[in-house]
Amino acid sequence: MVYPFELPTTSHLSFQSALSSHTHPSLPQSATTARHALRLALKAHNRLPRGFQRDSHLTSVLSAINDYLPYVVALAQGLNNGKPIDTTTPSTTTHLEEIRVAQRAELEPEWRATLASSSLRRPSTNRTRGTGVQYELAFILTTLGYILSSLARSGVTRTLYASTTPSAEQRTAAVQTATKHLLQASTIHSFLSSSPYFATVSEAATLPDLAPATQAALSSLALAEATLLTVLKDDSYVVACIQARNPNDKDWMVRAPEIPKVRAHLFARLCIRAAEYAEQAATGLSSVAAEGRKAGVDEDVARYAHVLGLVARARACRFFGVDAELAGKVGEGIAWLRAAKGALGLRNTGSASAEEVTTKSRGLSKLKLGFRERREERKLEKGAGGERVDKGGLGPGDNAGREEEGRVLEMLETKWVRANDTLNTQLIPSSADYVANLPSGRDVLPPQPPYTPPSLDEERLFQMRGPPTELELNPGSDDGDSDFESQAAGDAHTPGAFPGRADNAYY
């Protein structure tokens, strides 16, 4: 599916104390006001419990960051003598009036990193301080990419795993919207990794969040997820498997789930391309720690990218098996399914071929082999990640889709082996070399135009030509957002008090 990124939080920052503009005197103060709204939205978001409440709040955070982003871009252009911050792409908007901003003091924004390894994120006051508006803009764009990925994830999972089975139109609309969000996130991360404007930020930053290799890897990861979602839109096997597990679905009383013929060979090539994107992301994320920084990217993200590549290759093997089964080669199709299970680290429960039986050891060697297989399986399960699902609820099981793909493989293998044992009786070839001999991938996503930062419209620029008004913003305490998920009010009650009450009276 899509990785659930944590959104960073930030401390209070006053632009008017460090910047001034003689062309638009109200610009620094307006930027401070918009940033304060974003800061409150991020704090409120991370205090919500994971699940539906946090997913529903994403639109509020997106609205706040879209309102604030043009102000930061205007400040950056004003400090850049009115020139666009990215000279590699032509600007789509031209201002009738030029923005000039002067720097009176050093601007030092503070942001909490969310991709750094857990060993560096352990302290409660782990914000990193940067210098310049480049640092602020880089973190804002990175956060925007996380929000778009989170919107894509929540939209797909809430539709596919709803209590009522979605229609084909609902499924298509959800996947198309999620793909659009992921493509936007990919262009943003690519812009951060390639723009020379952020070169000084990446060199000075000690955390891996803003490193060019990290941003390039996140761009590839978003492309891998978008490609897999494109395949998922027409993957009737996953839909049938989810519908079979849905306790609220009653369509089976009327008719069996329809599984139309799919363009199996094309889908397999698309999944291979998604695997190539995911492997590029995993390599890039793993290499960040070797660039002389204090810490690398969190292992959960790197493991997720690695497992996502395995899931994509396993899905490609499944579609090759479907293609063989549609051609009447059910034995070859079963071999492809077992190759897919091997790629996922799942043990084959079906009957093994004669070649596989003769190569198995006996005694202690066989016991060691079983322990090694279980250890590798647990490692892949840990790397796939997961989310909490309410008791009796329906959910994907893990972030990378490994568990869902394993269910589909088990369903197809059980069906095909039964048919082969009773009707076809075809020999099942060895699946040892199937994954290694996969063809190259094929792109399905259209080329995306380079990301262009938004600019303020002429009406708002005209309003900021006047003098600033008195602004009173309470920075508040930064201790309240030290944790991403706040504890409930009743969890920290006084001993002897009734949980959930503010008083501590005895009765």
UniProtKB/Swiss-Prot annotation:
Region annotation (Disordered) ranges: 375-405, 439-507
InterPro entries registered for this protein in UniProt: BRO1_dom, BRO1_sf, pH-resp_palC
GO cellular component, one term: plasma membrane
Protein origin, superkingdom: Eukaryota
Residues annotated as domain BRO1: 1-288
Pfam family for this entry, one: BRO1
GO BP: any one term: cellular response to pH
Compositional bias ranges of the Basic and acidic residues kind: 375-391
Function in brief: Required for the proteolytic cleavage of the transcription factor pacC in response to alkaline ambient pH.
Annotated family: Belongs to the palC family.
Name this polypeptide is given: pH-response regulator protein palC
Gene name tied to this protein: palC
